[in-house]
Amino acid sequence: MWRYLPKRSLDLNRKGLMQRKLDDKYFINTFDEETKLYSKKENTLLLIVDEQPRLMKALENGEEAVLNTIALIKAFEKYDMPIIATEQYPKGLGSTDERILDLIDQKNIFEKTIFDAAIPEVLDFIEKNNIKKVVVAGAEAHICVYQTTRSLLNLGIDVFLAKDALASFKESQKEEALKTLREMGAVRTETETILFDLARDSKDPNFKFISGLVKEMRAR
């Protein structure tokens, strides 16, 4: 079985044919030197940016973004992967959606007033936990998510933007932000893609759980 190796553009497969290698940033898991597979999940973080009801209710597809974020949370928890969240000026916008609060460790929710969620508390968490890749969900895609992703990319962190777990006041604003961030180097993806990328194999012990999440999403 051919396996991708990190940080190489070309290599030979078993048949001696040249095969292009993808950059590390396209793999949601980090590379495991022992197995020679992209299978390490503990270095991938779910960052939930400002999913507060007062904000999300004013955004196009805001409820869909929250529901898909919840699916991501459940998947990350199933694989024991780290999750953190930020709140933009909670005195004015209120706290994080209660459905999210019920699922995550509240000590990993950080308040902020600046739009960029790459605040000292978040960066400290990333450094202490050796985070290499970040999946971003939240709002608004063209403001806080945009500035956060730009900062993370500038630090050399691979960023995955879960399109259907992001929201803006207008869908066109989200699309423009995603386009620009992709040009910067972020990976544009969707919640369902992320879920199956975490499982990778129908023999994975958590595949049935992941499949259940996807069925719930498709039934909405």
Predicted regions and their residues:
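Intrinsically disordered, low-complexity segments enriched in serine/threonine/proline/glycine
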Residues: 7-8, 21
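Active-site-adjacent betaalpha module
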Residues: 19-22, 26-43, 91-220
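Active-site loop/turn elements of alpha/beta-hydrolase fold enzymes
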Residues: 51, 88, 164
